[in-house]
Amino acid sequence: MRIRNIRDAHLKINKAKNIIGVDNLKTKLDPKKFNALEIGSGKGGFIYQKAITNPGINYFGIEKNATVILKMINKSELLEQLTNLFIVHDDFALIDHEFPNACFDQIYLNFSDPWPKKRHAKKRLVDLAFLNKYQRILKADGIIEFKTDNDQLFNYAIEMINSLEQIKIIAYTNDLHSLDSSDALLKNNVITEYEQRFINLKKNINKIVFKFI
């Protein structure tokens, strides 16, 4: 469903202390801490819950839609009290070169835009070009978690991952919520309103965890 843009959303979000620019992001990246990045944070349901649950971890979200960020700010009353959550209003594809090498311990890709048309394949966040970007900014043994309701996008991700010898698949499933509750793929899984919607519809959720070797 298309989100109706809020007028001057980009100006309103800049007043929130958790919204930072790329330059400020570099100063927030503490090499002594565990740093996690979510690309395409949406309304922030996932990263917000992660930051609350894990105060010792620094969470960084990138979201290019100002209206979506504003909805997150308005919805999350405790947002500004969190000192370990930072949101960058930008497009990862345009700013990835600004990130230092080996600066993140973990990357999350949650319900990314599937870009279903073949001519848009390079825009998919699991395309080879993006995987190479992730490899550069991940620390040694850094982990990537990718979760999607879109089966075609998941199959594409598997194809891209299998084409690279330097990637090791740790675990994956085509039906996350059919697994036993003790399964590692469900450990610390955050169910957002978006994901719950698909669970209610009995739609399978795909998930893969992998790293570079």
Swiss-Prot record:
CDD domains documented for this protein: AdoMet_MTases (cd02440)
Reaction(s) the record says it catalyses: guanosine(46) in tRNA + S-adenosyl-L-methionine = N(7)-methylguanosine(46) in tRNA + S-adenosyl-L-homocysteine
Residue positions binding substrate: K117, D149, T192, E193, Y194, E195
One GO molecular-function entry: tRNA (guanine(46)-N7)-methyltransferase activity
Binding residues for S-adenosyl-L-methionine: E38, E63, D91, D113
Highest taxon listed in the record's lineage: Bacteria
Active site (UniProt): D113
UniProt enzyme class: transferase
UniProt keyword list: Methyltransferase, S-adenosyl-L-methionine, Transferase, tRNA processing
Signal peptide: none
One Pfam assignment: Methyltransf_4
Pathway where this protein functions: tRNA modification; N(7)-methylguanine-tRNA biosynthesis
Primary role: Catalyzes the formation of N(7)-methylguanine at position 46 (m7G46) in tRNA.
Descriptive protein name: tRNA (guanine-N(7)-)-methyltransferase
Organism this protein belongs to: Mycoplasmoides gallisepticum (strain R(low / passage 15 / clone 2)) (Mycoplasma gallisepticum)
